[in-house]
């Protein structure tokens, strides 16, 4: 398996940091660094979510009831789709950031500090961060709704199993048990 280079270790990003710092553009460096930190954090969380979804997929295989299994599978497919959308967005922003960093350094070398400042400003980092956060928030809300639905289905399945056991107890003359509250 190929190990990806961390975003902050990409040559283009490192060179941009050096150029910004060397020319006293601290605000611009902080903006770029905040985007890099956010993207690296999202990438880490993305990996964890993918791992958890694989575990849930494995647990889904244990469900015997076909109807419930199909419903849970649809909800899981939807969640996986949202996660893949977010992963695609992360990759897109990373690629654009590396390309923009390369262009900014190139502009600096040809035209000077003002061109560097304009190039970093053109990256619209605060707007990109805001859009990423909104997209992530929307995706997380959707996945939370799906997780809640799966939880409700599981709870109903447990209660149905308890009711079935109680019906059997009633048929043989045993005392029925009250269903436990979820």
What are these regions (language model features)?
Residues 1-84, 88-91:
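Leu/Val/Ala/Ile-rich N-terminal alpha-helices, chiefly Sec-type signal peptides and the beginnings
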């Amino acid at each position: 398996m190929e190990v990806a280079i961390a975003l902050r270790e990409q040559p283009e990003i490192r060179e941009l940091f050096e150029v910004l710092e060397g020319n006293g553009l601290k605000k611009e460096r902080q903006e770029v660094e905040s985007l890099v930190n956010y993207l690296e954090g999202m990438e880490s969380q993305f990996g964890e979510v993918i791992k958890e979804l694989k575990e849930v997929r494995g647990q889904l295989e244990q469900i015997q009831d076909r109807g419930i299994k199909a419903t849970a599978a649809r909800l899981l497919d939807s969640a996986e789709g949202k996660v893949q959308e977010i992963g695609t967005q992360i990759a897109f922003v990373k690629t654009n950031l590396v390309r923009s960093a390369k262009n900014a350094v190139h502009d600096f070398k040809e035209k000077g500090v003002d061109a560097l400042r304009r190039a970093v400003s053109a990256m619209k980092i605060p707007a990109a961060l805001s859009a990423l956060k909104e997209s992530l928030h929307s995706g997380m809300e959707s996945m939370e709704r799906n997780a809640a639905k799966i939880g409700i289905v599981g709870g109903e399945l447990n209660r149905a199993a308890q009711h079935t056991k109680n019906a059997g107890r009633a048929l043989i003359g045993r005392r029925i048990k009250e269903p436990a509250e979820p």
